[in-house]
């Protein structure tokens, strides 16, 4: 199973170079969430959409830099330039979601068949990028220690709308002691390109989350006695906006399954 595969190899993947892991992903040998892989390298969320929607989406990202920090834009070709040498947007992510008219219609490990020449791809910063820094400070990152995907929730924090795109900010959650939460705030503040500091700490209901045990994306994680949930803006936010805007086709990463940059 995925979980077992994860436990066996996660330690090996954490020390590997991004191009090595991307090659294993391209060959279909890694199909699990990428948290904890290639420690110290930024990871990215993906949104690919038809050119006619690209300007609205670029504007949506510009107006919402916390959940949607753009790292690179690829027009007309899935080949990546700055973020990963020799990398390809449609083969180098472990799992993709395909949306048609706002509805998820497919999950694939290779999205080449869906690519069209008038598509534009956006790589957006991901909070997995700063987890290495948290681990170095001795902060337990629960989804890594549990070997599962990070829990993600649609919040009641609304994004600034742009063109056809609007929707809630999706947040990722990591439980920790209040003392570690303060440390995590100070650490992640230094990473504005990958969501920066938390958007909320404590009571999930305050940001519209009814049941912390039922994430909208990813897996639930254990919150231990004396811990509080800490929430960061999350790059799955565009997927919620896509569900509202309903473009004819959109390719995204599957939540938790990231593009690992150089």
How should these model regions be labeled?
Residues 3-4, 72, 148-150, 244:
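Intrinsic structural disorder
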Residues 11-124, 169-240, 244-262:
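Metallocofactor- and cofactor-centric catalytic cores in central/energy metabolism, strongly enriched
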Residues 164-168:
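A polyampholytic, Gly/Pro-enriched intrinsically disordered region
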Residues 1-9:
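Short, Lys/Arg-enriched N-terminal segments with co-localized hydrophobic residues
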């Amino acid at each position: 199973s995925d979980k077992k595969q994860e436990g066996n190899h996660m330690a090996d993947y954490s020390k590997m170079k991004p191009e090595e892991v991307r090659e294993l992903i391209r060959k279909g040998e890694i199909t699990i969430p990428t948290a904890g892989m290639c420690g110290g390298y930024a990871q990215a969320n993906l949104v690919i959409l038809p050119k006619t929607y690209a300007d609205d989406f670029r504007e949506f990202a510009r107006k919402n830099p916390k959940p949607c920090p753009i790292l690179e834009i690829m027009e007309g070709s899935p080949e990546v330039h700055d973020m990963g040498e020799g990398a390809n947007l449609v083969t180098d992510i472990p799992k993709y979601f395909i949306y048609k008219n706002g509805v998820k219609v497919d999950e694939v490990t290779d999205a080449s068949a869906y690519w069209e020449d008038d598509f534009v791809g956006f790589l957006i910063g991901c909070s997995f990028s700063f987890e290495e820094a948290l681990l170095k400070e001795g902060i337990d990152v629960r989804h890594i220690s549990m070997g599962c995907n990070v829990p993600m929730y649609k919040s009641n924090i609304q994004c600034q709308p742009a063109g056809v795109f609007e929707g809630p900010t999706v947040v990722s959650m990591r439980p920790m002691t209040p003392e570690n939460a303060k440390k995590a705030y100070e650490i992640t503040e230094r990473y504005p390109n990958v969501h920066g500091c938390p958007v909320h700490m404590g009571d999930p209901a305050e940001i519209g989350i009814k049941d912390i045990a039922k994430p909208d994306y990813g897996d639930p994680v254990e919150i231990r006695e004396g811990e509080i949930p800490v929430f960061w803006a999350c790059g799955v936010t565009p997927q919620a906006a896509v569900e509202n805007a309903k473009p004819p086709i959109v390719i995204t990463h599957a939540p938790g399954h990231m593009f690992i940059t150089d």
